[in-house]
Amino acid sequence: MPLVELVERIVMINLKDKIEKMPHSPRYMGRRISRIFGRMVLDSRGNPTIEVDCLTEDGTIGRAMVPSGASTGRHEAVELRDGGNRWGGKGVDNAVSNVNGPIADALVGLDASDQGVVDTAMMTIDSTPSKAKLGANAMLGASMACLRAAVGDGEIWQHISDGQTSIPVPLMNILNGGAHANSNVDVQEFMIVPHGFESYPESLRAGVEIYHSLRAVLRDAGLLGGVGDEGGFAPDLPCNEDGLRYVVDAIISAGYQPGNQVSIALDVASQEFLHDDGYHIDGKVMNGSDLGRLYSSWLDSYPIVSIEDPFGEDDWDSWTEFTLREGHRVQVVGDDLYVTNPDRLAKGIEKNASNAILIKLNQIGTVTETLVVIGMAKAAGFGTIISHRSGETADSIIADIAVGTNAGQIKTGAPARSDRTSKYNQLLRISEKCDSYSKLFQHR
C-alpha cells in the first residue's frame, strides 16, 4: 500500500474515533443549524475578508472570521477574490454569495456538532482539489462558525481534544522582512522562542520584554523605522545575519539568556527570493546546497531552534539534503512546501524533506481537513506549529486549535496589535484552566 494511503487510513481511523469521543452530551447535541450568513469585514491590512455566522435552532450563534496570507504557496487552496477595480481587486462579494447561497443551502438542517458531516457537505459541493468553486475562504468561514456554534458557551480546545492538551510555546515575530515589510531584509520573520520557563504567562512576559528591548536596540543603532504586517520592527539592514545579531542583543538587553531561556526561529520564506537562476539573498545568487551551508553557518553561531521554508516549495532535493544533515539540531518546518495539504505532507514524509509542518487552516479550507493533517504529521513524528496569517483578524480560534490538538507550538506574530494579541490573550485565558505548558526546546 502506498505511504500516502496508509497514513491517511490511519489518520482517518483516529479522527473518526476522536469525533465519536467528542462531548456529544445534551450540551452539544441538538444544535441544528437554522441559518448560515456571511458578510464582508476588514482584516488587519485593511483588505476585505469574510465573516460567517452560524445560528442554531436553540439560539446559539457561532461567528468566525477568515485570515489571509501575503506570501502564499502556489499549492494552497484558492482564496476567492472578485478581481476588477473595487477594493483593488480584493473584494469577496462572490465568496460571500457562496456562503449565503450554496453553502447555506447545504448546511441548514445539519447538526453543527457533527463537524465531519458539516465539512463533508461543503466538500461534496466543491470537490475540486483547490476548492476553486466555492473558495477556501468561504468554506473555512462556515466550517469555523459551525464549530463555534457547536461549542456554544463551552471551550473549543476541550471540544476538539482527545484528552491530551498543553499551552503551546509561542514563536513571536519581532523583526519583519520579506513580503511582510517594506525593507531590504530577505528573511521574512525573525522570531523569539521563550521556551525556558515553567508557564505560559512567564514566557509571554519574556517575549514582550524582549520585543520592547529590540525597539530600544534598533533605536540606539539608528535603525528604528516602521513595522511590518505582523507587528514586528522592519529596519533596513546591511545583511540578513544582522537581524540575528540584533535579536540576540535584544534578548541579552532584556535580561534573558540566549539559548537557555530564549532561542530564535526563522521563517526564511525562500520562495519569495527564488528566481530561475537561483536564490537571491544578500546580493548573491545561490543554489540550494550553498544556501543550506549558509543556514548551517548561522546554526553554528546563533541559538536557532527552527527554520521555516528554507528552500522553495518544489525544491525537494535541497529540503532533503538539509534535513538529513541538520535535522538533528534544528526544526526544519514546511509551510509553502506542504500548504496544510495531506498529499503534499505524505510526499514530504516519504522524502524525509523536513521534520515539522506549519498548519494554516485557510490553506486547506475546513476544520476537519486541518485535524487530519495534524494527525498525519503527529503520526510521522513531525513537530506541529499552528499559525496565523499576515492578514489577520480578531478571531482567536487558532489558540484553541493549538491547545486542543496538543500542537506544542503557535506562531501568531509580534506581541502587539490586537489582531495578534487576541491569540496571546486567549492563551492566557485558557492557561487558567489548562496548566500544562509545552516542554519543547527545553532540552537546550
Residue positions per predicted region:
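Short, Gly/Pro- and small/polar-rich lid/capping loops
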Residues: 13-48
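Conserved phosphate/anionic-ligand binding catalytic regions in large, soluble enzymes, centered on
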Residues: 50, 130-150, 169-185, 229-232, ...
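Short beta-strand elements
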Residues: 50-57, 64-68, 172-194, 249, ...
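Catalytic core of soluble alpha/beta enzymes
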Residues: 241-444
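Active-site-proximal beta-alpha loop/turn segments in soluble metabolic enzymes
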Residues: 189-200, 224-240, 269-282
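Mobile "lid/hinge" segments at catalytic clefts and subdomain interfaces of large enzymes
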Residues: 165-228
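Metal- or metallocofactor-binding catalytic centers and their adjacent structured scaffolds
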Residues: 67-155, 159-160, 204, 232
